[in-house]
Amino acid sequence: MFDITNKNILITGATSGIGRAAALKLSLLGANIFFVARNEQKAQILVNEISEISDTKAVPIIGDLSSQTDIHSVAKVFNSLNIPLHVLLNNAGLINKERKETVDGLEEVFAINHIAYFLLTMLLIDRLKEANNSRIVNVSSGAHAFVKGFNFEDYQAKNAYKPFQVYGYSKLANILFTKKLSDILK
């Protein structure tokens, strides 16, 4: 079993849902929790909750994963700490009823659910390599089954927006990325 006592874990999507539950449980197990949050108020609530149940660190890094500039800033903040990253838990995600674009002009669901995972992982890969036996956890789902193959021509859903299809593409991309990353890092 992977002992996480005093290990540094960075979690995206930590202020609600699965990410919040993971942050609380991992802090109880002795991990130092660093997390990305868009909302400072929600971030402070999580810091308070962790400090009530654990003596480990709870450090928010404010940033919006729909913005590639913010993702670079988040990585820069973590990298500036000069500490190893033992676990990167890419958990942030969403599904939209209608097509929305990010500030970078990307379809929002694919940008947050996959591109953010990819970019943040690549920007933190050296910190992960510094840690002995580090882990990258990319949260996905069975939603990849909504799609048959990957539509490289319209993965940004500019021609026809189908919420479950776009979500499925993002989750399929995560699975393919995780598999390739596993092969590369062996």
What are these regions (language model features)?
Residues 1-186:
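Rossmann-fold NAD(P)H-dependent dehydrogenase/reductase core
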